[in-house]
């Protein structure tokens, strides 16, 4: 039996025994309170105990009236009648809802092309503004040109046209280069222009017309030229007289001998010949001296053309040749007032940029106008111009970077039957299909059929000869053009593809490719029929690389075959730009095989159909 200790009553002993048990509960409750997460402050209402229990009054709440100091310490002006700007979170929620409601196809746009994006964009707002300015010009008569220049345009440059209407790029570039538009910079500074327009739109004429006009205007004001012409005329009068006159003691050369007024730089010798041919047409009516020099000519011919006693007004050359001449004779750039760089996207890239920039620097002291011309504005060219020429005046057309809708693009899947990844077979079959379809229709003369000129583009120059040999083995008239081809031979090859004259051959009695003309309808017993080689007489094929895709005016080409898928949209634009030139229709065919970017081809085709500018 338990007994309480002495000195303590039973009640005190019971309280002492219960005291430690009662102390366990607060510590346990404290530990549980620390384990549970605390309730955030945003979950509890401020002043919840002070909420009135009275029912709310019906009707809108009264607007809070600010006191006399309510406009102090505000970050935004609370102006009545101006809607509040939504927060960033509200804009994100709204944009997400809009994207859900849109159609997926409309929202996607170019996905595969965005991975490359080699072209500098031009806003559609600017394109629309350019369209409005273009409509103001409808004829060459509206340009402030000399009468002789206008006559040369109608009779020499564009004789085959019934209506002489300037193209979009000519409506924009010619007035600007003539000085019709007011320039913000002083006349003493060099004027800088960039002409950018789609392929086959007449860019060459857009810079030749103002340049020739400016040269003739400056020639009329040149005192040295006037004095030379006066002395020359007096010499002719003395020679016509019957009296004997002693010969002149010195034979004074022309003031422009070896010092041209305008220089046109192009990347290849083929373009040198092409631009020179157009200048020669102008020179029949507008009297000026033009010379073309390239590696196709010997040193003696180049020297005679540059330092001709009759002088030189316009020089067409390549950067390599002109740079080497300027090193030995710097005076060749001393009187240059107009410097035109055609195919600027090529001449200002890594390969040509040092030479081209050096020529620009040497000609800058006397230079009045610097004109860059290109069918595309790559990002590399755009960044170069922003650094070197930040104030350049960009003259672009609304359809820049867009392949014309008059050019149709077809796709041949080489992986399927009957080709089975044989691109050579697919290329030959495509050419045979074009030739057979053309042979079914007579040409302008009965019994004759037109010859179809076809360009085949490959990515590697080693492939050109291989594809050409295969096509020849299949009865197709094909030749290869690459850097390995001699330059004289290159000009001969391109002559038949750049000439606008139609070619025709005699139409065979049987269908092209049939065996009835070459094989008897019977074979003697025990003998084997001789092998028969089919031949397609109404086609001419040129297999080339990007050498033939820049600037060559292939007006006679209606079909372009892309043997390899181009590396970028820039190559797409230049290769497909060899057809459908100057408003004509054309057709491009892409051979898509294993490993090719089908998504890129698909988006380019959709962009062509919708008339969009590629990126």
UniProtKB/Swiss-Prot annotation:
- Helicase ATP-binding domain: from which residue to which, for each copy? 184-395
EC number of the protein: 3.6.4.13
Report biased composition (Basic and acidic residues) as residue ranges.
90-108
* Swiss-Prot/TrEMBL catalytic activity: ATP + H2O = ADP + phosphate + H(+)
Q: Does the keyword Magnesium apply?
A: no
Its recorded name reads ATP-dependent RNA helicase mrh4, mitochondrial
| Region spans: Disordered | 21-108
Protein localization? Mitochondrion
* One GO term (biological process): maturation of LSU-rRNA from tricistronic rRNA transcript (SSU-rRNA, 5.8S rRNA, LSU-rRNA)
Query: Record's SUPFAM superfamilies?
Result: P-loop containing nucleoside triphosphate hydrolases
Keyword set includes Mitochondrion: yes
* GO annotation, cellular component aspect: mitochondrion; nucleolus
Q: GO molecular function: any one?
A: RNA helicase activity
Species source reads Sclerotinia sclerotiorum (strain ATCC 18683 / 1980 / Ss-1)
Domain notes, please?
Answer: The Q motif is unique to and characteristic of the DEAD box family of RNA helicases and controls ATP binding and hydrolysis.
Q: Which InterPro entries match?
A: DEAD/DEAH_box_helicase_dom, Helicase_ATP-bd, Helicase_C-like, P-loop_NTPase
Task: Summarize the protein's role.
Answer: ATP-binding RNA helicase involved in mitochondrial RNA metabolism. Required for maintenance of mitochondrial DNA.
Q: Where is the transit peptide?
A: 1-37
UniProt motif DEAD box: location: 342-345
Q: Give residue ranges for domain Helicase C-terminal.
A: 444-615
Gene from which the chain derives: mrh4
Please tell me where this protein is predominantly located: mitochondrion
Q: Where is this motif: Q motif?
A: 138-171
Q: Quote the record's binding site residues for ATP.
A: 197-204
Q: Which family does it belong to?
A: Belongs to the DEAD box helicase family. MRH4 subfamily.
Enzyme kind, highest EC tier: hydrolase
Keywords in alphabetical order, please: ATP-binding, Helicase, Hydrolase, Mitochondrion, Nucleotide-binding, RNA-binding, Transit peptide
């Amino acid at each position: 039996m338990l007994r309480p200790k002495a000195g303590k009553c039973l009640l005190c002993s019971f309280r002492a025994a219960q005291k430690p048990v009662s102390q366990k509960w607060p510590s346990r409750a404290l530990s549980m309170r620390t384990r549970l997460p605390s309730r955030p402050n945003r979950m509890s209402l401020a002043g919840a105990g002070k909420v009135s229990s009275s029912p709310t009054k019906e009707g809108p709440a009264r607007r809070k009236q600010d006191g006399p100091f309510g406009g102090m310490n505000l970050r935004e002006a609370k102006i009545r009648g101006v809607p509040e700007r939504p927060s960033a979170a509200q804009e994100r929620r709204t944009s997400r809802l809009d994207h859900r409601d849109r159609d997926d196809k409309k929202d996607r746009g170019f996905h595969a092309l965005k991975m490359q994006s080699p072209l500098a964009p031009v806003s559609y707002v600017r394109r629309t503004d350019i369209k409005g300015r273009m409509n103001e010009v409808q004829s060459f008569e509206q340009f402030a040109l000399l009468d002789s220049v206008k006559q040369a345009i109608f009779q020499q440059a564009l004789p085959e046209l019934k209506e002489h209407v300037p193209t979009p790029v000519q409506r924009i570039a010619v007035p600007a280069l003539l000085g019709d538009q007011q320039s913000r910079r002083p006349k003493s500074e060099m004027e800088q222009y960039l002409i950018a327009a789609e392929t086959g739109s007449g860019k060459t004429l857009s810079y030749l017309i103002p340049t020739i006009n400016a040269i003739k205007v400056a020639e009329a004001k040149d005192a040295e030229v006037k004095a030379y012409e006066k002395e020359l005329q007096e010499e002719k009068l003395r020679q016509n007289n019957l009296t004997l006159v002693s010969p002149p003691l010195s034979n004074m050369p022309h003031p422009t001998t070896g010092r041209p007024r305008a220089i046109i730089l192009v990347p290849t010798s083929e373009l040198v010949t092409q631009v020179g041919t157009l200048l020669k047409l102008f020179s029949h009516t507008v009297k000026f001296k033009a010379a073309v020099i390239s590696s196709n000519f010997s040193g003696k011919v180049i020297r005679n053309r540059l330092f001709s006693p009759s002088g030189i007004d316009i020089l067409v050359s390549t950067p390599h040749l002109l740079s080497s001449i300027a090193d030995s004779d710097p005076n060749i750039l001393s009187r240059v007032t107009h410097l035109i760089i055609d195919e600027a996207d090529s001449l200002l890239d890594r390969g040509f940029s040092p030479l081209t920039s050096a020529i620009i620097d040497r000609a800058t002291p006397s230079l009045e106008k610097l004109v860059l011309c290109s069918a595309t504005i790559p990002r590399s060219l755009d960044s170069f111009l922003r650094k070197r020429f930040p104030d350049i005046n960009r003259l672009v057309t609304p359809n820049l970077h867009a392949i014309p809708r008059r050019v149709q693009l077809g796709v041949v899947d080489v992986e399927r039957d009957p080709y089975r990844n044989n691109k050579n077979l697919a290329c030959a079959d495509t050419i045979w299909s074009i030739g057979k379809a053309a042979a079914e229709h007579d040409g302008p003369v009965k019994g004759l059929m037109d010859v179809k000129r076809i360009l085949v583009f490959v990515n590697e120059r080693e492939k050109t000869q291989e594809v050409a040999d295969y096509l020849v083995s299949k009865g197709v008239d094909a030749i290869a053009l690459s850097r390995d081809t001699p330059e004289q031979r290159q000009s001969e090859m391109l002559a038949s593809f750049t000439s606008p004259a139609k070619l025709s051959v005699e139409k065979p009695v049987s269908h092209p490719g049939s065996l009835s003309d070459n094989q008897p309808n019977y074979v003697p017993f025990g003998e084997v029929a001789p092998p028969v080689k089919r031949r397609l007489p109404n086609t001419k094929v040129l297999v080339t690389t990007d050498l033939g895709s820049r600037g060559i005016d292939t007006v006679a080409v209606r079909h372009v075959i892309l043997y390899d898928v181009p590396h970028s949209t820039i190559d797409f634009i230049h290769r497909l730009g060899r057809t459908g030139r100057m408003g004509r229709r054309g057709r491009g065919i892409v051979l898509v095989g294993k490993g090719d970017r089908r998504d890129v081809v698909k988006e380019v085709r959709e962009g062509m159909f919708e008339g969009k500018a590629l990126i």
